[in-house]
Each structure stands twice: as C-alpha cells, then as structure tokens.
C-alpha cells in the first residue's frame, strides 16, 4: 500500500508554524510513542510550552475545542489517563498515517 516514505513513528510533514495569535488549530504533536491532541490559537507558544519542536507536529486541522473533543472521543481507547496524551498505536497511528498520505497527495496535485 502507498504511504509516506518515513517510518510511521516519524513526523513526515513540515508544517508552517504561524507567529503570534491565529485562528484556532487542533494539533497532533508527537513525543516518542505518545501523541498530544490539543487546540491552540498560538501554536508557536504551545510548542515551546511543551518543550518540543515544530518537527514534532504530526497533523494540524482548522478547528476549535469542539473538534478537539471529537478527536478525543474518536481515540478514547488510546487515551493515557485523564490527559490530552494518547498512545500512538492502532486506530490513532492509522489515522495519522492516512492523513499524512492525504496531505502529501493534496500537495502533489497542486
């Protein structure tokens, strides 16, 4: 099957991180085998707060807390305790891979 050229556990998309305040984004940011699904209107600050780098961003979606909560429900089986962190395995890992492939295909068709 088609897929990104990098391993599933490596960030594959180089996202542009806006400076300062912006419309809300739901982000999937990786730290080892864990994925944080959160929302922010200042992505650059959030990355610094988490002591991570832009390269750790796996996916970005336009959306607010409602969309974030939809993702939390969708991947509830992978949730780590009562946090916004999820084990990046099973359906969550598949989703990240599939969305990465979708983004690459959209970029190629431009």
Q: Which residue stretches match the model-derived regions?
A:
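Non-catalytic accessory segments flanking enzymatic or RNA/DNA-binding domains
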Residues: 1-110
């Amino acid at each position: 099957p088609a897929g990104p050229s990098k391993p599933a556990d490596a960030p594959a998309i180089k996202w542009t991180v806006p400076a300062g305040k912006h419309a809300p984004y739901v982000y999937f940011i990786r730290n080892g085998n864990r994925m944080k699904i959160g929302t922010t209107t200042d992505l650059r600050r959030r990355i610094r707060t988490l002591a991570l780098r832009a390269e750790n961003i796996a996916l970005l979606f336009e959306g607010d807390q409602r969309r974030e909560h939809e993702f939390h429900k969708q991947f509830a089986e992978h949730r780590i305790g009562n946090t916004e962190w999820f084990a990046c395995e099973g359906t969550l890992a598949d989703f990240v891979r599939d969305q990465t492939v979708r983004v690459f295909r959209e970029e190629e068709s431009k």
